[in-house]
Amino acid sequence: MFLLHEYDIFWAFLLISSVIPILAFLISGVLAPTREGPEKLSSYESGIEPIGDAWVQFRIRYYMFALVFVVFDVETVFLYPWAMSFDVLGVSVFLEALIFVLILIVGSVYAWRKGALEWS
């Protein structure tokens, strides 16, 4: 028989971590002042009134840098726990991590050759 009482701490943590943000939003909605005026409805940018049109188009180059950053950030997230338990896991996990790193190296070489890492 499956014992559910072993998961009591998990369910309590899940309930508490769900209730706290909901209560924070509800309390801030009740206690926050709701006065709207021209100052609240105006745009604000770094302490000065914005000049010009608000629709600014970014070059695709910025998105490529962000995408490459996310790929290497995810790589770090996956490799850190592996590195911390490297001595316990064994050779098969080492080979899997090596394949993972090789795939990322191939991807970074591809991005480099396509010019995604060139700033100018």
UniProtKB/Swiss-Prot annotation:
It is found in: Plastid, Chloroplast thylakoid membrane. It is a multi-pass membrane protein. Keywords: Chloroplast, Membrane, NAD, NADP, Plastid, Plastoquinone, Quinone, Thylakoid, Translocase, Transmembrane, Transmembrane helix, Transport. It is an enzyme of class 7 (translocase). The chain crosses the membrane at residues 9-29, 64-84, 88-108. NDH is composed of at least 16 different subunits, 5 of which are encoded in the nucleus. This is NAD(P)H-quinone oxidoreductase subunit 3, chloroplastic. It comes from Acorus calamus var. americanus (American sweet flag). The gene is ndhC.
